[in-house]
């Protein structure tokens, strides 16, 4: 669960298990690129889509792979991160030291389900915004390098 942040999966820290153990524990299906994963505790409610990755990986005990057969995965990811869903999630969670939710209770929480066409429009919009954010981020990084070069030139 520590690798899943809101809308982002980090591969900075990785733990490895043997192929034999992987085959034993992954009896409920292998996660695929684009699947939506959700943390059920520590931290509660982080959600992201699985990015392109070069190897199989294990989904830990506090992570659920959400079914997306009827929903656009991008739409599902953002619906699960909405303020409305978070309020419902916190209302059904339990635990004094570590807050979490059981999968049966999670399955009873609802999200709005617009037509597939509207879900796809939303997903296309999110993709465009993400591309624009990436372009802006690259520009900021380039400007930062230029600033450092000028500072080096002026101040040695």
Residue positions per predicted region:
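Ligand-binding loop in jelly-roll beta-barrel domains
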Residues: 53, 68-73
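Glycine- and charge-enriched low-complexity intrinsically disordered segments
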Residues: 74-84, 91
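Amphipathic alpha-helical coiled-coil/heptad-repeat segments
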Residues: 108-156
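A short glycine-rich beta-alpha junction/loop motif
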Residues: 3, 40, 56-64, 74, ...
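Short, solvent-exposed loop/turn positions at domain surfaces
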Residues: 24-25, 95, 134
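Sequence-specific dsDNA recognition surfaces
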Residues: 2-33
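Short, Lys/Arg- and Gly-enriched loop/turn segments at beta-strand edges
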Residues: 44-51
